[in-house]
């Protein structure tokens, strides 16, 4: 089974591209969604995180703002949180792989926003970077509610620059020319990979 790592900076269209892979029948593992599920009421992270960070659970779920207040800017607290969450996400991901394999899928996608920043490229076979021109990215991001130019710049400062991501990618999906163009690229990429696997 071929594992594709899908990543891209904020506003590049990664979520939309991820959905395009799903529409083509490729299972997609969404790392952010996995963490949300772990933090939700009944999630496996709720009890251990509350033990480590008392007061962060509200109505049976982890309140991300309260957790953030205890963790941001505190590398020791962040390391403690990661020691709880990362193994749970890892177990969740293994379950995803096992199910995809049992269903006979040849290709799966791991949707990981900070793929390069967390060393995730070592866990995948090929890296797909979603990209768009900087002015398109800026326009998309600043159209979001609650977003300011300052917030946008702060987010960019924490992410690997787009040019670096593209240079390290095996494949690039350009979303700057519209959805149909991006969808064609996704289909062409899957055709290429499936042909290579059956050759």
UniProtKB/Swiss-Prot annotation:
Pathway: Cofactor biosynthesis; coenzyme A biosynthesis; CoA from (R)-pantothenate: step 5/5
Identification of the protein by name: Dephospho-CoA kinase
Family: Belongs to the CoaE family.
CDD domains the UniProt entry points to: DPCK
Assigned keywords, A-Z: ATP-binding, Coenzyme A biosynthesis, Cytoplasm, Kinase, Nucleotide-binding, Transferase
Top enzyme category: transferase
Catalytic activity: 3'-dephospho-CoA + ATP = ADP + CoA + H(+)
SUPFAM superfamilies per the UniProt record, alphabetical: P-loop containing nucleoside triphosphate hydrolases
Residue span, DPCK domain: 3-199
GO biological processes: coenzyme A biosynthetic process
EC code: 2.7.1.24
Binding residues for ATP: 11-16
Organism: Caulobacter vibrioides (strain ATCC 19089 / CIP 103742 / CB 15) (Caulobacter crescentus)
Localization: Cytoplasm
Predominant location: cytoplasm
A GO term, aspect molecular function: ATP binding
Gene name tied to this protein: coaE
Gene Ontology cellular component terms for the protein in this record: cytoplasm
Function comment: Catalyzes the phosphorylation of the 3'-hydroxyl group of dephosphocoenzyme A to form coenzyme A.
């Amino acid at each position: 089974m071929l594992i594709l790592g899908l990543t891209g900076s904020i506003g590049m269209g990664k979520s939309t591209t991820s959905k395009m892979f799903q529409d083509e029948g490729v299972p997609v593992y969404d790392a952010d969604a996995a963490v949300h599920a772990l933090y939700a009421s009944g999630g496996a992270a709720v009890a251990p995180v509350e033990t480590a960070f008392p007061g962060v659970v509200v109505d049976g779920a982890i309140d991300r703002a309260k957790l953030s207040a205890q963790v941001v800017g505190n590398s020791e607290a962040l390391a403690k949180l990661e020691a709880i969450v990362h193994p749970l996400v890892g177990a969740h991901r293994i379950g995803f792989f096992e199910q995809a394999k049992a269903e006979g899928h040849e290709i799966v996608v791991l949707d990981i926003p900070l793929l390069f920043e967390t060393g995730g490229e070592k866990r995948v076979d090929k890296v797909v970077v979603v990209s768009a021109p900087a002015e398109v990215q800026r326009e998309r991001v600043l159209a979001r509610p609650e977003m300011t130019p300052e917030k946008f710049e702060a987010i960019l400062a924490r992410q690997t620059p787009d040019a670096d991501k593209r240079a390290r990618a095996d494949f690039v999906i350009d979303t700057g020319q519209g959805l149909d163009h991006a969808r064609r690229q996704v289909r062409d990429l899957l055709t290429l990979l499936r042909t290579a696997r059956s050759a």
